[in-house]
Amino acid sequence: MSFDLCTIDWTAIGSIVTFVAMIIAYWTIHISDKQNKSNQRLQLLLVQRDIEQKRLDELVENIMIINDSMQPIVVTDYSVKLINGIFTEDDRHFIDEMAANDLANNNRLSVQLIKYDRKESAKKVLMTLSNMRRKYGEWIRNLSILNLYKSSFVISPQDLNRMILTMVQISKEIAPEYKKDIDYVIKTKDNDLNKAINLMNIFCYVISTYLNEQKKIFEEELYAFVKEEQKRIDNIVFHDSIK
């Protein structure tokens, strides 16, 4: 078979070649566009993961600051010092510093509760911590008030009475088994200062025991929460990128 170049329709062949070239060009652009979109999605997922990781790290850091500030041994030691009349000026300054830190921790905790109000797993951990901090804060305030009243009588009897009522309420709430001992102190004919000192003896033990028990529960809850959150964050890129 022989071909006559003059009889070949070069225009038709040129159209076919152009069409094929257009298909190749379109496919190349399509693949490139798909890769670009995939890369963009990957970048967005990486940014999302970094943001989530920073949020978790910030939350855990704030939680640990608050948790570490509440030491049961401190509650016992400084209460015993005050009860036994060996509370020094340095001790007073230390308690004042603790009170300032507790106020800062309360504000820090309030911010975290606002941020995680809609996230139940985080909120559960924060509420456990909040309950501990509230009772620990009451101990700090009561110890400060009792020291002021004992050393200089600079607070009113009404404030002293409110402090007594607070210690009674919290002690019975946490450790109802001490109700009989608490009622015995209240019914004695001692003055309010001596009643408050005797109640502090019970109150400090109740608070320190409560903190020891709650810290174990809290730390288990925190560990479980962080484990699940970290797993979720680590899977952001892997699971979402293959969808």
Regions found by a protein language model. Name each.
Residues 7, 39, 43-61, 119, ...:
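Short, solvent-exposed segments of well-ordered alpha helices
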Residues 18-24, 72, 154-164:
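Intrinsically disordered, low-complexity serine/threonine-rich segments
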Residues 97-243:
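An amphipathic alpha-helical interaction surface
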Residues 15, 22, 57, 239-243:
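Structured catalytic/translocation cores of nucleotide/phosphate-coupled proteins
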Residues 6, 11, 93, 98-99, ...:
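Intrinsically disordered, low-complexity regions of eukaryotic proteins
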Residues 37-91:
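Amphipathic, membrane-active segments
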Residues 1-46:
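Membrane-embedded hydrophobic alpha-helical segments
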